[in-house]
Amino acid sequence: MAFRTDGSSHKSGVKREVKLANDFQNNKVLAEAIVNTKLSTDYVSQHIGGTTHKEDITITSNGTTHKISLKKKEKGICVGSFDWINSSKVTSSEVFKEVRELYSECRVKYHGEKDKVEHVRKLINDQSNQTLENMTSEQVWSILEKNIINPYKNSNIMLLIDDISSNKIYCIDSIKETELYDHYLKRTPITLANPSGKAKSSRVIMFDEKNIGLRIRVVSNNGIGALLGIKKKSSSNSNSKPTVKVQQDNVSGFIKKCKNIRVV
C-alpha cells in the first residue's frame, strides 16, 4: 500500500483545523456543545497546529482552556483510519537502534544512487520487520503510554472525530473513555500480529488476543528517494527519517466502544 510523502494529507488536515477553529469562534452554541459547558461572551477559539502539540484547537473561557485533538474523516467513519502517533521522535528509543543505524548507513552508502531505491527499501523493510518481531509487550506499552495515554490524560485533551461526510462531530471528552485506556489500567498483555503474514513494516496490536483496531507501523516519513537525496533540492521533503505511526483502524468500532460519547 502506498502512502503519501508529499505533505498533502497534512495540509488538508490543517486547513480543516483552521476552519473548525473559526467556526467555533463564530458560533458560541456550537463551541459550547463541543466542550459541553457554558462559555463566557469573550471566549477565544484558536488554531494551534504544529507537530509539538497533541491539541489542534483550544477554546479558552473564564481562565480555563479546553484542549482539542481533531481527527478528520472526510469519507466517513467507516473508511480508513486516523493517526494517534506519527513521529520520528519515537524511534530515538533503544528499541529502534538498528533501524536508525540502517538509515544512517544507507543515507551515506547509497547517496544519489537512484537505481538502489528498491534495494534500500527492501533492507529497511526487512529491518523494520525484525524490529517489530522482537518487540515485547512492555516495549509496546511504553510507546502507547508515553505518546498517547500520558499526553492526552495529563493535559486533559479531548478527542473530536470530524465525520465530514455526515456532518457529525463525535466528541470524546477524555482518553479515559476509550477501550485503550481500559486495557492500560489492566496492563493487558500485548502481542503484535501479522494476519496476512506478508506485512513487513506493520503489525496489528493485539490486547490479550483481542483486536481493538490499533496498528503500529515503522515507515520512512518522506520516502526512500528523500533518504538517498535524489529528490529535488527545492522539495521541502529532501531528507527522510524512520518514523513510528500508531493508527486507529475501524474508526466506527472505536467510537462504539467509547463511553459517554457525544455527537454534535
Please annotate each region the language model reported:
Residues M1-E55, T60-H66, K71-V264:
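Short, positively charged
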